[in-house]
Amino acid sequence: ASTDIYHRMFHGPRFQPLIGVVASIQDENGRGIEARVHAIKDIPNPELFNTGAGEKQPMMLAHPMLIESCFQTAGLTSMDIDGVDSLPVGARRIVLSDEISGGSLTVLSVRTGSSSDSSTLHNSVIRLDGAPVLKIDGLRMKSMAFLDASERPGLIDSE
């Protein structure tokens, strides 16, 4: 549940796009998790930009909180596999769909590797009713602090 996720993460209520983890996953690239994401209309603070009277909200192809959900899911994956709190510091490529409409949203994050500077690499995908609508390849998460074994979320099935 989201209360379990955000008990471990420092994100305030306006930055909590994840509803809960639904599965531990493994593919040819690595292990990770799949989580449910709030519908666009239900993501906290959908209007992130301050606009004056009469100004229009900027048009966006993808809601910023969907990208944030990729970051948070990769962070949860690193907490579980590597025992670290981490923050996003870069990505090799981000691919967005032309339009992201309503439907059931999930995010998958698979840890694909690590580097000598204690960063981890992830591939993350947002799916709408099972079809990919946003993909981040080579998401790099930088380790910020080590966790005690008791602080790991225990979301990913052991090998």
Feature map (PLM): residue ranges:
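A conserved, well-ordered hydrophobic junction motif at loop->secondary-structure transitions
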Residues: A1-E159
